[in-house]
From Swiss-Prot:
Zinc finger (GATA-type): 327-354
Species whose genome carries this gene: Dictyostelium discoideum
Region annotation Disordered: where it falls in the sequence: 20-51, 203-296, 399-484
GO biological process: adenylate cyclase-activating G protein-coupled cAMP receptor signaling pathway; regulation of DNA-templated transcription
Entry keyword Membrane: no
Protein name in UniProt: GATA zinc finger domain-containing protein 13
Coiled-coil positions: 356-433
Stretches with biased composition (Low complexity): 23-51, 225-247, 399-482
Keywords recorded for this protein, A-Z: Coiled coil, Metal-binding, Zinc, Zinc-finger
Domain of life: Eukaryota
Basic residues compositional bias, start-end: 269-279
Gene3D superfamilies with a match to the protein in the record: Erythroid Transcription Factor GATA-1, subunit A
Length: 508
């Protein structure tokens, strides 16, 4: 199938046989009429096909399934091609055995040539009328009937559509009349194709005089020298009813400003959408006045033939705003209509172009990830703290050996002092008791003095204990005093810390 954009063809609605002798003679010397032999017909036909592809031809070649009657099994070769001005096709037949002989297709100024077709089965004749156009040598075939069953039985490889018309100068430009032809690409038989002829000088379509002219919007190019504009002639695509209608002309009579039904619904107020509308209006056969049909503003739904034309859109979910987004599969950079749906507590977005579902994260997943991050940070921090505690405990084991000796010595001294004081107090009490009978006032004074002495001794002991604690704290690391975690994890420091608080509370 030829490229649709390159050749400006929407559908195969006209079938034409054209003259390629000029292009073939200019492009490939092997394609000259004087050099054709029965031995190298296949090579010449291949060369012709290559030349036509290089020239970007916009013709469709549909030919009847003629098979040659000779000993050669190759059905793609010619039989009895003469190099004179009178070119003869001899001994061709249809698949059912009906012979067709086409003789004396002249290149002079004669208007008509009658040929006959012999049928072995029914012994009847078919008349093929060939005529010339005033603007050029254009031959027309009238009442040419091709059985669709025979066409379907014929293999596709045997259809060499150029064989009947190659290397014959100005042979047939167009098949016309009532023809049943096989639409090879779409597989549809087209009925009642109206007669047309082509002017080879201007490459424009000239309707026949005997048939009415359908109203078709056409673009013609009168410049024959510009080979790059070979695809300038465009045709509007026929409606779907044209393939099954008995009268093709009535179906083709359409208003030129008819709205086109396109698969892409474009929003207003955008320069890109306007350019797309103009291109679509030219392809759909609208007028070139710049008047684009009014299209209702709807959400953009992109439906391409290469993608899923009917995407499944979930019923649940709320519609999102139209936003520019590039799908990961269909790679469409446009505003795609997305829908968000909650499936198994996972949010998904559905692309209407290809039906792709992109998974999105829920809040629960995000919260779990945040928790994991926090726990990882805490674990790292706790590991550092544990390391500090281990270092502290190791240091404490080394320092307690020195501090305990000092504290024990001081405690012993304090205890000795206390004992001495107690002994002194007892002595004083004894003395006081002995003196009670004599002087009550003196006893009271003595008791008061003893109490004061005891309080002083207690204060001295407390001061000694506080000094020892301060010495221990100064000998340890600063982390021991500053770190909150060390107070929580170390039992030794916890006991000392609360003991110190108890002593301080007693002093207060």
């Amino acid at each position: 199938m030829e490229n649709q954009k390159k050749n400006n063809f929407n559908q195969i609605d006209y079938f034409r046989w054209a003259d390629y002798s000029k292009n073939n003679n200019n492009n490939n010397n092997n394609n000259n009429n004087n050099n054709i032999n029965n031995n190298n017909n296949n090579n010449n036909n291949n060369n012709i096909n290559n030349n036509i592809d290089n020239n970007n031809s916009f013709y469709r070649f549909i030919s009847p399934p003629f098979n040659k009657i000779n000993n050669n099994n190759n059905a793609n070769n010619f039989n009895n091609i003469n190099n004179n001005n009178n070119n003869n096709f001899n001994n061709y037949q249809l698949n059912d055995g009906n012979k067709i002989s086409i003789n004396n297709i002249l290149n002079d100024n004669t208007t008509t040539t009658n040929t006959s077709a012999n049928q072995n089965s029914a012994n009847t004749n078919k008349t093929y009328n060939f005529s010339k156009n005033e603007n050029g040598i254009v031959y027309e075939i009238d009442n040419f009937i091709l059985d669709s069953n025979l066409v379907r039985e014929q293999p596709f490889n045997n259809f060499n559509y150029l064989n009947i018309i190659n290397n014959i100068q100005n042979f047939l430009q167009l098949i016309s009349g009532k023809v049943n032809l096989l639409n090879v690409i779409l597989g549809i038989l087209v009925d009642d194709v109206n007669r047309y002829s082509v002017n080879p000088n201007s490459m424009s379509i000239i309707p026949s005089d005997n048939f009415p002219t359908p109203q078709l919007p056409l673009e013609t190019n009168t410049d024959l020298n510009n080979t790059s504009d070979c695809s300038s002639t465009t045709f509007s695509s026929p409606p779907s009813s044209a393939f099954n209608s008995p009268n093709l002309q009535n179906d083709y009579t359409q208003p030129q400003n008819q709205k086109s039904q396109s698969s892409t619904i474009v929003k207003k107020n955008s320069s890109k959408s306007k350019s797309k509308n103009n291109k679509q209006s030219k392809d759909d056969g609208e007028t070139n006045d710049g008047e684009s049909p009014e299209i209702e503003e709807k959400r953009v739904i992109r439906l391409d033939m290469n993608l899923n034309p009917n995407p499944t859109i979930p019923k649940r979910g709320r519609p999102l705003k139209v936003r520019p987004f590039e799908c990961s599969i269909c790679k469409i950079k446009c505003s795609i209509y997305w829908r968000r749906i909650l499936i198994n507590e996972v949010r998904t977005s559905v692309c209407n172009a290809c039906g792709l579902r992109t998974m999105k994260k829920t809040k629960k997943e995000n919260i779990e990830k945040k928790k994991n991050k926090i726990s990882n940070i805490l674990n790292d921090h706790n590991s550092e703290i544990d390391n500090q505690i281990i270092i502290y405990l190791n240091q404490k084991k080394t320092t307690t050996t020195t501090t305990t000796t000092t504290t024990s010595s001081t405690n012993n001294l304090n205890n000795n002092n206390n004992n001495n004081n107690n002994n002194n107090n007892n002595n004083n009490n004894n003395n006081n008791n002995n003196n009670n009978n004599n002087n009550n006032d003196n006893n009271n004074n003595d008791n008061n003095n003893n109490d004061n002495n005891n309080n002083d001794n207690n204060n001295n002991n407390n001061n000694n204990n506080n000094n020892n604690n301060n010495n221990n704290n100064n000998n340890n690391n600063d982390n021991y005093n500053d770190s909150i975690y060390s107070r929580l994890y170390s039992d030794d420091y916890e006991d000392e810390y609360y003991e110190g608080e108890e002593y301080e509370n007693e002093d207060e």
